[in-house]
């Protein structure tokens, strides 16, 4: 059975957002696990990973609610946020490629 129109897009968007929610929960869980076992000593790194996990989880929930309810404003907000995240990731990737390893180590420290 083939789905067409918005039904197929809705199902694909719901599945994608469920995967994003699982990734967000995984990030939060791994950060808590690493902190509990003492694998990572920097609270800033743990906090950053948890913040990214929570952000991803919230955005995925917004996308899932928008797709299920066919809420156009929420889907537009979701699209804008994902576009900004893409631009941010692209900028960080270009920055990482532009500097060498010694400068990267200096920035991290």
From Swiss-Prot:
Residues that span the membrane, as ranges: 13-33, 45-65, 73-93
Side of membrane Cytoplasmic, spans: 1-12, 66-72
Family of the protein in this entry: Belongs to the tetraspanin (TM4SF) family.
Cellular component terms (Gene Ontology): membrane
Subcellular location: Membrane
Organism from which the protein derives: Sus scrofa
Positions in the Extracellular compartment: 34-44, 94-109
Lineage: Eukaryota, Metazoa, Chordata, Craniata, Vertebrata
Membrane topology value: Multi-pass membrane protein
Pfam families: Tetraspanin (PF00335)
Keyword Transmembrane helix applies: yes
Source taxon at top rank: Eukaryota
Glycosylated residues (UniProt): 100
Keywords: Glycoprotein, Membrane, Transmembrane, Transmembrane helix
UniProt name for this protein: Tetraspanin-31
């Amino acid at each position: 059975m083939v789905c067409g129109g918005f039904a197929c897009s809705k199902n694909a968007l719901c599945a994608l957002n469920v995967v994003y929610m699982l990734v967000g929960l995984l990030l939060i869980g791994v950060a808590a696990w690493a902190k509990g076992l003492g694998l990572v000593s920097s609270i800033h790194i743990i906090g950053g990973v948890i913040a990214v996990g929570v952000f991803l989880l919230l955005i995925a929930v917004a996308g899932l609610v928008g797709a299920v309810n066919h809420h156009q404003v929420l889907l537009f907000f979701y699209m804008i946020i994902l576009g900004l995240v893409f631009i941010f990731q692209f900028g960080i990737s270009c920055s990482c490629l532009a500097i060498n390893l010694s400068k990267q180590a200096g920035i991290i420290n």
